[in-house]
């Protein structure tokens, strides 16, 4: 027999309304014990909530949803009372006294909904993403994922792959047919169509991933180059202390900002130099740790100091120490001191933004550059939120499609193409949970709130 679970569905603490949710075969028994009756399905009933001895603990609205017409697909009872934590704890304690009822694990209601085919895995993840959204655009995109926009695109890809697999395997199973299915051009055309279709989904998923997770941008450079001033300019407030004393910033400072809906984690670091002060040396060590973990580096140069702004010197002292795959934007700061105009240029393969963090002249150029460099497009309609695991699955599927194309066009190997298509189908199906390990499910749902 399936277990019956209970948890507080609203956030802990004081509030106007507090909700307890019960899901499982004993939901009607809980209703009888607490309410004295089971409400009619999907009909709100205003009733007292009673303790075991008949004492009224609270009064409020009771809602009953009969299986399978509920969020979890099981019998569900919701008790909506006052939001005082003491009252809710008393009611929860009373429900847990009933035999066969236990406290729900984090995310267990959503997990039951997934296991009962009420929503797929991408939709279940979207519940947590909607709750955690930090911007209006992220919230709208999470809602679209919850409504199945992302899953629909993935399922369309899976259907296309299954159709092509069937066609390829038919050509393998009937080799004596006069028509050479592998050579008639239809399979290659379909395969290239799937590759293009997947590339469109990957592009949209990348934007969705930026919306969900943000991008980590580290501001680095020599002491007194204006790193903290730039952090303040981007944040729109005095987030960091700014002085003329080199080495003022000795630890890592973090700010979370949005540029037209794109979330950025901006990190200001200690100035990079050979320091003798132990505290400053620790700060510089932490700065290099942050640099190695960044999605992009903003390298600050002092344009008023010719030696500091010498790109050839910067290349040997700093750029040569970075991973070759780490994107770098060079910012020439303090143009207000030498009368330069704000501008964007390119030199030695690096984008260079000339600006003044003090007067904010050119800061808008940097904001636009960061948006473009991160591949973020403002105002895209119909977007969805995506997680890192989704991007990984899409990337692996794309790799195996390309391998399959080579097997077809260069080696005419139908069996090997069929195997690559099987792997593509498997990776895509992981996104929606059609092929998913128990460990992955545990990791996903354990990150949810209790009561969700």
Curated annotation (Swiss-Prot):
Name of this protein: tRNA modification GTPase MnmE
Top-level taxon: Bacteria
Entry's localization field: Cytoplasm
Cofactor: K(+)
Primary localization class, coarse: cytoplasm
Residue ranges of domain TrmE-type G in the record: 214-375
Cited PROSITE patterns: G_TRME
Binding site for (6S)-5-formyl-5,6,7,8-tetrahydrofolate: 21, 78, 118, 452
GO biological process per UniProt: tRNA methylation; tRNA wobble uridine modification
Transmembrane spans: none
GO cellular component, one term: cytosol
E.C. no: 3.6.-.-
Keywords per UniProt: Cytoplasm, GTP-binding, Hydrolase, Magnesium, Metal-binding, Nucleotide-binding, Potassium, tRNA processing
Record-listed Mg(2+) binding positions: 228, 249
Subunit and interaction comment: Homodimer. Heterotetramer of two MnmE and two MnmG subunits.
First-level EC class: hydrolase
NCBIfam families per record: mnmE_trmE_thdF, PRK05291.1-3, small_GTP
Functional summary from the UniProt entry: Exhibits a very high intrinsic GTPase hydrolysis rate. Involved in the addition of a carboxymethylaminomethyl (cmnm) group at the wobble position (U34) of certain tRNAs, forming tRNA-cmnm(5)s(2)U34.
Family listed: Belongs to the TRAFAC class TrmE-Era-EngA-EngB-Septin-like GTPase superfamily. TrmE GTPase family.
MF terms (GO), sorted A to Z: GTP binding; GTPase activity; metal ion binding
Binding of K(+), residues: 224, 243, 245, 248
Family matches, as SUPFAM superfamilies: P-loop containing nucleoside triphosphate hydrolases, TrmE connector domain
Manner of cofactor binding, per the entry note: Binds 1 potassium ion per subunit.
Binding site for GTP: 224-229, 243-249, 268-271
Database matches in Gene3D superfamilies: P-loop containing nucleotide triphosphate hydrolases, Probable tRNA modification gtpase trme, domain 1, tRNA modification GTPase MnmE domain 2
Cited CDD domains: trmE (cd04164), TrmE_N (cd14858)
């Amino acid at each position: 027999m399936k277990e019956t679970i209970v948890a507080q569905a609203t956030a802990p603490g004081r509030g106007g309304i507090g909700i307890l949710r019960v899901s499982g075969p004993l939901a009607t028994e809980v209703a009888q014990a607490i309410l004295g009756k089971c409400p009619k399905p999907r009909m709100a009933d205003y009733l007292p909530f009673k303790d075991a001895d008949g004492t009224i603990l609270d009064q409020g609205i009771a809602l009953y949803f009969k299986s399978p017409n509920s969020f979890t697909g099981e019998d569900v009872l919701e008790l909506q009372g006052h939001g005082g934590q003491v009252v809710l704890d008393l009611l929860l304690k009373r429900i847990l006294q009933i035999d066969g009822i236990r406290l729900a694990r984090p995310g267990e209601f959503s997990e039951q909904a997934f296991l009962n085919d009420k929503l797929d895995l991408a939709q279940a993840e979207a519940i947590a993403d909607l709750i955690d959204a930090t911007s209006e655009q992220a919230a709208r995109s999470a809602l679209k994922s919850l409504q199945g926009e992302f899953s629909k695109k993935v399922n369309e890809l899976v259907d296309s792959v299954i159709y092509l697999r069937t066609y390829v395997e038919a050509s393998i199973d009937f080799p004596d047919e006069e028509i050479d299915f592998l050579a008639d051009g239809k399979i290659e055309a379909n395969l290239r169509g799937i590759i293009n279709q997947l590339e469109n989904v990957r592009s949209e998923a990348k934007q969705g991933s930026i919306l969900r997770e943000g991008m980590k941008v580290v501001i680095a450079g020599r002491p007194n180059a204006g790193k903290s001033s730039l952090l303040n300019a981007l944040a729109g407030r005095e987030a960091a202390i700014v002085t003329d004393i080199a080495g003022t910033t000795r630890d890592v400072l973090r700010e979370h900002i949005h540029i037209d809906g794109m979330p950025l984690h901006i990190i200001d670091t200690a100035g990079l130099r050979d320091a003798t002060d132990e505290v400053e040396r620790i700060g510089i060590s932490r700065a290099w740790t942050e640099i190695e973990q960044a999605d992009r580096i903003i390298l600050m140069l002092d344009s008023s100091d010719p030696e500091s702004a010498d790109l050839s010197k910067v290349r040997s002292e700093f750029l040569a120490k970075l991973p070759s795959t780490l994107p770098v934007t060079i910012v020439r700061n303090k143009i207000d001191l030498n009368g330069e105009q704000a501008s964007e240029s390119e030199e030695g393969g690096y984008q260079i933004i000339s600006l003044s963090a003090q007067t904010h002249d050119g800061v808008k150029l940097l904001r636009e550059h960061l948006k473009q460099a991160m591949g973020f497009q403002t105002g895209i309609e119909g977007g969805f939120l995506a997680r890192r695991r989704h991007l990984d699955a899409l990337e692996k599927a794309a790799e195996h499609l390309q391998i399959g194309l080579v097997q077809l066009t260069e080696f005419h190997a139908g069996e090997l193409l069929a195997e690559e298509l099987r792997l593509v189908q498997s990776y895509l199906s992981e996104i929606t949970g059609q092929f998913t390990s128990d460990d992955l499910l545990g990791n996903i749902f354990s990150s949810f709130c209790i009561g969700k």
